[in-house]
Amino acid sequence: MATLLHIDSAVFPQGSASREVTSTFVKTWLEEHPEGKVVYRDLAANPLPHLDFAAVSAGAQNTLRAELADELAAADAVLIGAPMYNFTIPSTLKAWLDQVIIVGHNAGSPDGPVASIPFTVVASRGGSYAPGTPRADFEFVQNYMEKVLGGMFGASVDFIVPELTLAPSKPEMAELVPLAEASRSKAFEDAVQKAKDLAARLAA
């Protein structure tokens, strides 16, 4: 029985693009893998504390950090909803990363205990920060998540990127609505296909 660790971090419980896409991913994964298990953390509803001196000093001996590290190590795959807030990830997701990354325990080595776990990140954003766009240099979600998960854990990271999510609600972005709708449709298609691919991979 495979385990999927599902993490959401969007502050909006309803109407969140990242939550809608991660939900579609999980639904498809369970349909393809009915014996699978999903462990869910909603970091907006139940935020973790930021690291303090005691937690850093204790490392894996800290109760919370050990719990989070064990939860991650027990997963066969990880799904993370990471909407862009102020050009980067939500602070609640950063707190989870800071707590769960323990150098010398599960991080800092390319062949550590998390290296074989595939990560899928739903990186939604209100505008477009794709290569070649005017604000490409402001993209600190995909860049950061790829570097931190790949660099600290040695893990592979796959992305689903719903862009221009604010276009339908912003009159000044009206001309971008068709692009937003296309991006949204592709994100759901990607979620379904990647969930199916992951389920097949874990069942092999």
Show the residue positions of the predicted features.
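N-terminal beta1-alpha1-beta2 submodule of the flavodoxin-like/Rossmannoid cofactor-binding fold
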Residues: 1-82, 87-102, 178, 188-204
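Active-site donor-binding loop signature of nucleotide-sugar glycosyltransferases
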Residues: 43, 124, 162-164
